[in-house]
Amino acid sequence: MKFGLFIAFAFPLFALDGVVVNVTTGKPQAGVAINLVQPSQNGMNQLGATTSGAQGDFKIDKQIPPGPGLIQATYQGTTYNMIITPGTPTTGVQVQVYDSTKKAGVAKTLEHLILIEPGPDNIKISETFVLGNESKATFNDPAKGSIQFYLPDSTGGKAQVVITAPGGMPIRRPPVKTPSAGIYKIDYPAIHFLRKGTQ
């Protein structure tokens, strides 16, 4: 019994509540899938899940071990992340989402860099795209992708793709072949950001 009480105090009840706001419309957003996860050595541990209500409200009552948590809000095919660090208020949290669009021109290529590094047996080519999106919408076109690029047949379609959003962690994605010969795409949303960033 004492052991059970000790565990209860060591891992206090973590009540997370707040509202989801659609920045595109400026209104609370209903029907957004909310997941509370925590990073671990074995990946992400899901701690709780819910869906935002009619007024965009959500609440998750869950015990959480010490350390940061991560709110993942999925809306119109895009997942928005918000880190909850120890000591950060967990009530009245505002999670922001955006309407998604396939409209061309919402996300723009600000820079396109190619680095060629010759080696003893091969040539390493690094291609970098810097995207910008200053609209109040997320560019998300799974059919065409956010970026398309060419890979020679000699690569066998093998390329390392790393996506880094402003203030975010690097994310690896496999290139996806399109119907056009040698053309591959990256299916990853271009989320709104005001300052130049990389993706």
Task: Give short role names for the model-derived ranges.
Residues 2-13:
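Bacterial N-terminal signal peptides
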Residues 16-199:
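Lumenal/extracellular ectodomains and adaptor appendage modules
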